[in-house]
Amino acid sequence: MDTKALHTLTYGLYIITAKKGDRFNGQVANTVFQITSDPPTIAVSINKQNLTHEFIQAGQGFVISVLAREVPLSLIGQFGFKSGREMDKFAGINYKLSEGGLPYLADHTLAYLEASLNQTVDAGTHSIFIGTVTDAAVLLQGEPMTYAYYHQVKRGTTPKTAPTFTVGREKDKTALASPKYQCTICNYVYDPVQGDPEHGIAPGTPFADLPEDWTCPICGAGKDAFEQI
């Protein structure tokens, strides 16, 4: 079986948020889809190991923030490669509350949809949470971030708990003639040809010439967490 066929499927990139008691948590997800229009019903796939999974079950609802294409990698890193068990993911984040009191991102978000959980489907490592939309609004005009754009243009990577993660797929196989370095935490690849313009690193800057305080654009790891590939 050629599993590369799965790579032809298209996805978006979203922040899924939920509430448990007086605490908020959220994560990046790419498997979000509309099921029906009357009533408007949406679904999201969440790994059972993730804290957000626990929060959705406890709060019986969730919010989807539709990310804009221009979203910084650092925001994706905060919600996609860090655990809410170890930190407050909303620290330093500009967010607002939906009608149901659930958080959504106020910046870099085209729209949000709040859903009341009405069904959970067991999908092995993941649960598919199905909910009826109870609140929604368009916040910005623009192009949504897609999974393909995130990987091909932003050079982003996939958390191991994502439904689309494939072992070995995140390793860059580029020849060593143009040395690239890969983050051992989140698999981000620093390419000297492209640099890191978002953080002031010009294209053509070798990894060795990066400032000592430079950190991974996605997860924030230091240079010592990178290995040549």
Curated annotation (Swiss-Prot):
Fe cation binds at residues 183, 186, 216, 219. Binds 2 iron ions per homodimer. Binds 2 FMN per homodimer. The occupancy is 1.3-1.9. Its cofactor is Fe cation; FMN. The keyword Hydrolase does not apply. Residues 178-229 form the Rubredoxin-like domain. InterPro entries: Flavin_Rdtase-like_dom, Rubredoxin-like_dom, Rubredoxin_dom, Rubredoxin_ET, Rubredoxin_Fe_BS, Split_barrel_FMN-bd. Keywords: Electron transport, Flavoprotein, FMN, Iron, Metal-binding, Oxidoreductase, Transport. One of its GO terms (molecular function) is oxidoreductase activity, acting on the CH-NH group of donors, NAD or NADP as acceptor. Residues 1-158 are annotated as: Flavodoxin-reductase-like. Induction: Constitutively expressed. SMART domains: Flavin_Reduct. GO terms for biological process: alkane catabolic process. Pfam families: Flavin_Reduct, Rubredoxin. Disulfide bonds: none annotated. In the N-terminal section; belongs to the flavodoxin reductase family. PANTHER family: RUBREDOXIN, RUBREDOXIN-1-RELATED. Has nitric oxide reductase activity in combination with FprA; probably involved in nitrosative stress protection. Acts as an NADH:FprA oxidoreductase. Homodimer. This is High molecular weight rubredoxin. It comes from Moorella thermoacetica (strain ATCC 39073 / JCM 9320). The gene is hrb.
